[in-house]
Amino acid sequence: SPTCTGADRPCAACCPCCPGTSCKGPEPNGVSYCRND
């Protein structure tokens, strides 16, 4: 089954950010990342 995306990893459609993190971005490189809340 899909797993959650950990902090400081790119947000992925398959795998929501893990509890305590949320998708932030996009950053200067154009990628959004899961970051600690």
Curated annotation (Swiss-Prot):
The site (Critical for the neurotoxic activity) lies at: R9, P10, C14, C15, Y33
What the entry lists under SUPFAM superfamilies is as follows: omega toxin-like (SSF57059)
Q: In which tissues is it expressed?
A: Expressed by the venom gland.
Query: A Gene Ontology MF term for this entry?
Result: potassium channel regulator activity
Q: Which UniProt keywords apply?
A: Calcium-activated potassium channel impairing toxin, Disulfide bond, Ion channel impairing toxin, Knottin, Neurotoxin, Potassium channel impairing toxin, Secreted, Toxin
Q: Name one GO cellular component term.
A: extracellular region
The record's principal subcellular location, in a coarse class, is secreted
Between which residues do disulfide bridges form?
C4-C18, C11-C23, C14-C15, C17-C34
Per its UniProt record, what InterPro entries does this chain match? Answer: Toxin_16 (IPR012499)
Cellular localization per UniProt: Secreted
Q: Where is this site: Important for the neurotoxic activity?
A: V31
What's the superkingdom here? Answer: Eukaryota
Q: Which family does it belong to?
A: Belongs to the neurotoxin 11 (kappa toxin) family.
Protein role: This excitatory toxin inhibits insect calcium-activated potassium (KCa) channels (Slo-type).
Domain note for this entry?
The presence of a 'disulfide through disulfide knot' structurally defines this protein as a knottin.
Q: What is this protein called?
A: Lambda-hexatoxin-Hf1a
Q: Which organism is it from?
A: Hadronyche formidabilis (Northern tree funnel-web spider)
